[in-house]
């Protein structure tokens, strides 16, 4: 009896696809740190990193070597187990969330019927990582940063989910591939769900703690926030995890609102991976542009903006979408 049954082969292929996708995401996340510094230098009319290699391209290699060889030091006053676990959870939760994102019609790790719910579950785990990091550090600035992060993330995750319910109501499924295929037969959701797109993008920036919602890490106020006591690879996991979060939110925006791997008007369907990559790169650059152009608001303004503006907007969008879908349902229309 052969061990290589069709079921075993499917499992092996799924594991290999997962390894390829996760390695590609980690590499892209590391490269984004260099890309961000070059773009910020260009937009702010300064040089940026340009000394290591041609056009500074080897700067990322120098940074990685420095990170690998720095001492992995644990301060004597920290809770060692939780202190070590926090960066692992932060990076792992974001990486695992990629398994439900379809990149091309044939390439993806897992085709789950609860794909969106799986993403929300993984996004929720990242809150615990930040809270663990601040609490286990026994540092008042780290604790304050983690409490800020928890309150901000919980607030914005409320309408991070509600912003997508309009998409789910129209498609009738939480499956990512179903959502992409629905957009191929109809309008991309950027048009009928424009307000949902706006609120999801704002919530995505806040959940990834990117500027202008980087209150948990505000250098001027909190001395780098919840990872002030981290060094070496532990700090590197938080650092790369932030860029992985940018890629994740950008890929979700493309999948849910911009037709996924489909080109505009069905142009060149054979270039599905290229379309997905180009659209994702556009939103990644938009994340970086926000950092270069918008000042950081006060923490109370960030929280007021979420509850007093974004949440009502998502509820109105959901109610209007549900009413339109209900009105157009044949059974209801016949009555």
UniProtKB/Swiss-Prot annotation:
EC number, UniProt record: 7.1.1.-
HAMAP family: NDH1_NuoH
UniProt keyword list: Cell inner membrane, Cell membrane, Membrane, NAD, Quinone, Translocase, Transmembrane, Transmembrane helix, Ubiquinone
PANTHER family: NADH DEHYDROGENASE SUBUNIT 1, NADH-UBIQUINONE OXIDOREDUCTASE CHAIN 1
Assembly behavior: NDH-1 is composed of 13 different subunits. Subunits NuoA, H, J, K, L, M, N constitute the membrane sector of the complex.
Major localization class: membrane
UniProt-listed InterPro entries: NADH_UbQ_OxRdtase_su1/FPO, NADH_UbQ_OxRdtase_su1_CS
Subcellular location: Cell inner membrane
Identification of the protein by name: NADH-quinone oxidoreductase subunit H
GO terms of molecular function: NADH dehydrogenase activity; oxidoreductase activity, acting on NAD(P)H, quinone or similar compound as acceptor; quinone binding
Role this protein plays: NDH-1 shuttles electrons from NADH, via FMN and iron-sulfur (Fe-S) centers, to quinones in the respiratory chain. The immediate electron acceptor for the enzyme in this species is believed to be ubiquinone. Couples the redox reaction to proton translocation (for every two electrons transferred, four hydrogen ions are translocated across the cytoplasmic membrane), and thus conserves the redox energy in a proton gradient. This subunit may bind ubiquinone.
Family: Belongs to the complex I subunit 1 family.
GO CC aspect terms: plasma membrane
Catalytic activity: a quinone + NADH + 5 H(+)(in) = a quinol + NAD(+) + 4 H(+)(out)
Annotated TM spans: 11-31, 81-101, 114-134, 154-174, 187-207, 238-258, 270-290, 307-327
Membrane topology note: Multi-pass membrane protein
Enzyme class: translocase
GO biological process: aerobic respiration
